[in-house]
Regions:
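Conserved beta-strand-loop-alpha-helix junction that forms the acyl-donor binding cleft
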Residues: 118-128, 146-149
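Conserved acetyl-CoA-binding loop of GNAT-fold acetyltransferases
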Residues: 123, 132-141
Length: 151
């Protein structure tokens, strides 16, 4: 297992991974289709430069990923990371890949002076078991405000 940052050189493998994930578990995906052309454009769009996707690679194929952002607060200098996506293909689960992806995130956090991350976790039995295995982490029910803006 190797780990790579998503970029133009592995975008096609990433798209193939998303197609597989969409076919296997469409209910866990946040989109109805894989926006292949959009992905090809986003990997080089400066707007997404602050987004990091680490891909778990097995023999040239993407089998899992973690996507996150670093950000900070001007007022107090607080630095943190937000994880917005973690997914491992069904055939590769229970092999420690998700834990390895989080380890890659934590190394990147350390290199950037970040000492905590958070995520809005999925609400299903498998996710609860996985996140429940984290040491030094708290699973909280935090009220979230989400508002979709009209274009």
């Amino acid at each position: 297992m190797t780990f790579e940052r998503l970029g133009q050189e592995n975008a096609e493998a990433y798209i193939a991974y998303l197609r597989t994930a969409m076919r296997e578990e469409p209910e866990k995906m946040t989109a109805e289709t894989v926006d292949e052309e959009g992905i090809r454009n986003r990997v080089s769009d400066p707007f997404y430069a602050g987004t990091t996707s680490i891909l778990a690679m097995d023999d040239g194929n993407v089998v899992g990923r973690i996507e996150y952002h670093f950000y900070g607060c001007m007022q107090d200098g607080y630095r943190m990371a937000y994880v917005d996506w973690v997914y491992v293909l069904k055939a590769y689960r229970h092999r420690g890949i998700a834990q390895m992806l989080f380890a890659e995130l934590e190394k990147d956090c350390g290199r950037n002076g970040i000492d905590q991350y958070y995520l809005i976790r999925a609400r299903n039995e498998e996710a609860d078991r996985f996140y429940g295995s984290f040491r030094g982490a708290a699973m909280e029910d935090v009220p979230i405000l989400r508002r979709y803006l009209e274009a």
